[in-house]
Design a protein with these regions (language model features):
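Catalytic cysteine-centered active loop of the rhodanese-like fold, especially the PTP/DSP P-loop
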Residues: 26, 39, 300, 306-357
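E1/E1-like adenylate-forming module used to activate ubiquitin-like modifiers
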Residues: 92-94, 99, 110-193, 234
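Glycine-rich phosphate-binding loop and adjoining beta1-alpha1-beta2 segment
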Residues: 50-86
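N-terminal charged helix/coil linker that caps or initiates catalytic domains
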Residues: 1-24, 248-258
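Conserved anion/nucleotide-ligand pocket segment
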Residues: 178-217
Length: 357
């Protein structure tokens, strides 16, 4: 039997709890891929996968569900195929879209536990608020250079619950905390933190709440293997308390993302680029694939952009694009000083809608 060895450890009743459970993983990346593999292997009955992005070659070193044949595929589609092959008993639901205030509540509604595998502060606060309102346990994980963090939110213990906002009531300023795309990441680190998260999910599903990281932030330094646990309490935080308030809350602005500087649809980008002396600047690294083919884009990687302003002075309207709108916004903020007289924008959707059209 597939689960014999773990049944020997924690019993058939707990295994049945896993088989009857439903877990949603938001983000099929460096955390999400190993998380999904582990949760499927341990016997979680139903898994949901949320991610709008496609597989790229530079993902492969840490996103173990994928290989070269998956490049260009939607991450959710590629992951479902691989997970189904690994464990045909797992029920899989793919949600190939970005999580927004419009869809977050319907997306999390049917699940017992939600796991945060994102790398975006705006989505992280949105997901935390929605799970708190819907009373969904949320297993948090984050990476920074050689360190990782794990905690469990929205589970009552000692008469109260805590959320992401109790830990981080204020979002960091732009450029304070880089994403994995910007700072880089080792697959050993993302995999270790994902294993901690998966273990917390199992604890929640079988009811081992006394040992779960509730009201506790686990900090793990992978260089010296120092583990630190920090206790935290419920705070008098300001947060949306209803679905309607989530709809009205400006998450990009709260996370210091100037919405007026963003183009959010392909149609808006089309209109922007029809202007005289307009250009699309791809700030991904040279080896990142696939290349944009909807427009002729100027390739200026973020790593060298501050030395290339002269190339852009010939244009009046400049829009930056990357994978998911993070590096492009950073490029825009850099350009505001060097190109103060230009019309500068960032394309929020990233490159995916601009290829294979």
């Amino acid at each position: 039997m597939r689960y014999t060895r773990q049944i020997q450890l924690f019993g058939a009743d707990n295994q049945q709890k896993l088989l009857e459970s439903k877990v949603l993983v938001v983000g099929v990346g460096g955390l999400g891929c190993p998380l999904l593999q582990l949760l499927s292997s341990v016997g979680v009955g139903t898994l949901g996968l949320v991610d709008f992005d496609k597989v790229e070659a530079h993902n492969l070193h840490r996103q173990f569900l994928f290989d070269e044949a998956c490049v260009g595929m939607l991450k959710t589609d590629a992951a479902v195929a691989r997970l189904q092959a690994r464990n045909p008993q797992t029920v899989l639901h793919a949600y190939p879209y970005a999580l927004t205030a419009d869809n977050v509540f319907s997306t999390i509604a049917d699940y017992d536990v939600v796991v945060d595998g994102t790398d975006n502060f705006s989505v992280r606060y949105l997901l935390s608020d929605a799970c708190a309102i819907a009373r969904k346990p949320l297993v948090y994980g984050a990476l920074y250079h050689y360190e990782g963090q794990v905690s469990v939110f929205n589970v009552e213990k000692d008469g109260y619950t805590t959320s992401y906002r109790d830990l981080f009531p204020v979002a960091p300023q732009p450029n304070e905390v880089p994403t994995c795309n910007e700072a880089g990441i080792l697959p050993t680190i993302s995999s270790m933190i994902a294993h901690f998260q998966a273990n917390e999910v199992v604890k929640l599903l079988i009811g081992d709440l006394d040992n779960a990281l509730i009201h506790t932030l686990l900090l793990f330094n992978t260089q010296n293997y120092q583990l630190t646990k920090i206790k935290y309490n419920m705070t008098d935080k300001k947060a949306p308390s209803t679905a309607e308030e989530v709809q009205q809350f400006n998450y990009p602005a709260f996370c210091h993302q100037p919405v007026g500087d963003e183009l959010t649809t392909v149609e808006a980008l089309d209109a922007f680029l029809t202007q005289e002396k307009a250009v699309l600047v791809d700030v991904r690294e040279e080896d990142e694939q696939p290349k944009i083919d909807r427009y002729t884009a100027l390739s200026l990687p973020l790593s060298v952009l501050p030395t290339q302003w002269e190339q852009l002075k010939a244009y009046d309207h400049i829009c930056f694009v990357c994978v998911a709108g993070v590096r492009s916004m950073k490029a825009l903020n850099f350009a505001k000083e060097a190109l103060a007289d230009k019309d500068l924008k960032s394309f929020k959707q990233g490159f995916s809608p601009l290829v294979n059209v």
